[in-house]
UniProtKB/Swiss-Prot annotation:
Keyword presence, Transferase: no
Protein name per the record: Kinetochore protein Nuf2
Family of this protein: Belongs to the NUF2 family.
PTM note: Can be phosphorylated by AURKA and AURKB.
Organism: Homo sapiens (Human)
GO CC terms, sorted: cytosol; kinetochore; membrane; Ndc80 complex; nucleoplasm; outer kinetochore
GO terms under biological process: attachment of mitotic spindle microtubules to kinetochore; attachment of spindle microtubules to kinetochore; cell division; chromosome segregation; kinetochore organization; meiotic chromosome segregation; mitotic spindle assembly checkpoint signaling; mitotic spindle organization
UniProt subunit comment: Component of the NDC80 complex, which consists of NDC80/HEC1, CDCA1, SPBC24 and SPBC25. The NDC80 complex is formed by two subcomplexes composed of NDC80/HEC1-CDCA1 and SPBC24-SPBC25. Each subcomplex is formed by parallel interactions through the coiled-coil domains of individual subunits. Formation of a tetrameric complex is mediated by interactions between the C-terminal regions of both subunits of the NDC80/HEC1-CDCA1 subcomplex and the N-terminal regions of both subunits of the SPBC24-SPBC25 complex.
């Protein structure tokens, strides 16, 4: 018994705990150490045990003086003085094992001993402390469960309200459905028309650009050819410049010189003719003079041909330059037209982008609101999950407490059955005792009758 799971209190501590936890009022004030030690008073212990049973089981005082309903006694009036003791023993026999006291006996109430009584009271006080702590914990869990249930109801209501708001946001009102449909149809038609117009203009611009690019490529090719021809002509011109004069003055001077030369040649020719006429007979000199004249004539003819060729080349180069300038102006016009088309296309794209941006912004606002509502719902769901986990833990603890209560009830039922068995044994013993008393009374009555009859006979004999 020394290794039990409750502390052993001394008499002073037991008196203090009994005054604070078990006995109240005048009974607690009148309790002293002499009532418990060294010779415990049975009536004080009966009062303490009854009060402890009232605290733990809720048994009222009058129940100790009542016959149990589930028992049948032939002479209940004979047990009126014995009922409080019997009920107290029965309840203590089931209550003290819960307090880790397993050696309780009936003699501990009839003839209590100080050490055993202090141990029994220590176990009862420890159990009452444990019961109060468990009750506080249970009440705290119960309060948390109620508050969690209220919060869960509030969160469910908020969740339902958020779902209703989300449905209202997702659904278009009846009075705005027609307008919303018209707006959506108008936006779709506008987008389709813009897409078609943009596609057509893009195709036209692409065709015009491709055609103009082909023309530009042809003209560029022609221009490159002309540039090559100009370069070749310039090379020819450079080569001819060595042969001809560069400036008009020089050309004039050269022409004058040539004229002078021609005149000189004419004069020389005249002289030659004169000489020919003079020297007609000079046959040997005539061929050489003719060859020289032919050479000079050939040179003059080459010079005139080169001059005409140079003039034609210059004219052709001027024509090519004019054509290049006209092609460049046409190319500039095409570029300006292309830029205007690009600007128009950019304006159309900007209008389409603004319309699309407004639509996307509206959709984004709706999506953002949906996301906020969904985040709120997720937060509510997370809180609900946390509350649900707390409720499940509380329910598990409640189940554990209920299991402990059920175990206590089972133990109480077993003790009840045990006490009923004891009561039946006492009942049978009492009935046997009553039968013996009746038989003894009958025997004594018979003996008394015999003795009275014998005395009467003796008195009759003495009188006669």
């Amino acid at each position: 018994m020394e290794t039990l799971s409750f502390p052993r209190y001394n008499v002073a501590e037991i008196v203090i705990h009994i005054r604070n936890k078990i006995l109240t009022g005048a009974d607690g004030k009148n309790l002293t150490k002499n009532d418990l030690y060294p010779n415990p008073k049975p009536e004080v212990l009966h009062m303490i045990y009854m009060r402890a049973l009232q605290i733990v089981y809720g048994i009222r005082l009058e129940h100790f003086y009542m016959m149990p309903v589930n028992s049948e006694v032939m002479y209940p009036h004979l047990m009126e003085g014995f009922l409080p003791f019997s009920n107290l023993v029965t309840h203590l026999d089931s209550f003290l094992p819960i307090c880790r006291v397993n050696d309780f006996e009936t003699a501990d109430i009839l003839c209590p001993k100080a050490k055993r009584t202090s141990r029994f009271l220590s176990g009862i006080i420890n159990f009452i402390h444990f019961r109060e702590a468990c009750r506080e914990t249970y009440m705290e869990f119960l309060w948390q469960y109620k508050s969690s249930a209220d919060k869960m109801q509030q969160l469910n209501a908020a969740h339902q309200e958020a779902l209703m708001k989300l449905e209202r946001l997702d659904s278009v009102p009846v009075e705005e459905q027609e307008e919303f449909k018209q707006l959506s149809d108008g936006i779709q038609e506008l987008q389709q028309s813009l897409n078609q117009d943009f596609h057509q203009k893009t195709i036209v611009l692409q065709e015009g650009n491709s055609q103009k690019k082909s023309n530009i490529s042809e003209k560029t090719k022609r221009l490159n050819e002309l540039k090559l021809s100009v370069v070749s002509l310039k090379e020819i011109q450079e080569s001819l410049k060595t042969k001809i004069v560069d400036s008009p003055e020089k050309l004039k001077n050269y022409k004058e010189k040539m004229k002078d030369t021609v005149q000189k040649l004419k004069n020389a020719r005249q002289e030659v003719v004169e000489k020919y006429e003079i020297y007609g007979d000079s046959v040997d000199c005539l061929p050489s003079c003719q060859l020289e004249v032919q050479l000079y004539q050939k040179k003059i003819q080459d010079l005139s041909d080169n001059r005409e060729k140079l003039a034609s080349i210059l004219k052709e180069s001027l024509n090519l330059e004019d054509q290049i300038e006209s092609d460049e102006s046409e190319l500039k016009k095409l570029k300006t037209e292309e830029n205007s088309f690009k600007r128009l296309m950019i304006v159309k794209k900007e209008k389409l982008a603004t319309a699309q941006f407004k639509i996307n912004k509206k959709h984004e606002d709706v999506k953002q609101y949906k996301r906020t509502v969904i985040e709120d719902c997720n937060k509510v769901q997370e809180k609900r999950g946390a509350v649900y986990e707390r409720v499940t833990t509380i329910n598990q603890e409640i189940q554990k407490i209920k299991l402990g209560i059920q175990q206590l009830k089972d133990a109480a039922e077993r003790e009840k059955l045990k006490s009923q068995e004891i009561f039946l044994n006492l009942k049978t013993a009492l009935e046997k005792y009553h039968d013996g008393i009746e038989k003894a009374a009958e025997d004594s009555y018979a003996k008394i009758d015999e003795k009275t009859a014998e005395l009467k006979r003796k008195m009759f004999k003495m009188s006669t």
